[in-house]
Structure formats: C-alpha cells, structure tokens
C-alpha cells in the first residue's frame, strides 16, 4: 500500500504543472523590448499565451522555452540555448521586431505569424481562416489589453 501511494505521489509530481514566478523574466522582457523598440506588453502577452512563463516549456512540435521558439527560429535570432531565459526572450523579441517590420506594425498579423509562421501569413495576409490561428490572435490580444490597460478594457469586442 505504501509503495502504491508513493508511486501515485511521484506520478502526480511529474504531471502537476510547476508554478512559475515570472518576475525574473519580466526584467529581460523590459530590457529587450526597450532595446528593440517593441511593446513590452506584446512580448509579455506572447509569453502568457505561449508558455505561461514556464522557461522549460516544450511543445509537441518542438518549440522551446518561454517564447516557444522553434529550433531554426531560435538559432536565426541568436538563442543557442532556447531554455535559457535571457537568450529566449532576446531572440523572441528580435523575432517579434522582425515581424513588426514585415507586417507594418499590424498586431493581428504579427500574432498570427508568430503562431503559424511568417511565410504562411505573409502569403494570405488577413485571410487567415484557421480557427486555431484566430483563437491564438484573440488570446494574445486579450493578454495584451490586460497588460496595457487592465482587465476591464480587455472585455471590449474585437474582430480579428
């Protein structure tokens, strides 16, 4: 009986999500957002949605770290260890900056491209019909509005 309880406890500890304190990473968000002149609220909103501030997050598709960078994107923007908080935020913020330039500051397209890949969104522009992409854009927008204006402002209706 003790052995069974111990196994259940160990299994629960492995499955239960870890509580992550975002405070240490938020300083890097402010630092790199300021350096690359991109909204720190946007970067933080992407992290909220992508990993919920878990620096060890690993997706089923292989995206890694706080900003869920794919290996090629991480290398392209200078994160050689995507699980390193500072490298991940620096590279992710550089990527967001590149997307801001590519999509002329349109936050909907930036969020869609961050989720679905910049090449697919560049071809279709606002004609993204994938419900997962639309849901992602809305989730990022909601977190952005909460961070920028507080929870009440985020309740306004938004069309992607």
Which positions does each model-derived feature cover?
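N-terminal signal peptide c-region/cleavage motif recognized by signal peptidases
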Residues: 13-15
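Enrichment for repetitive, rod-forming helical segments
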Residues: 9-10, 148
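Catalytic glycan-binding domains that act on GlcNAc-containing polysaccharides
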Residues: 19-160
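Sec-dependent signal peptide recognition
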Residues: 2-8
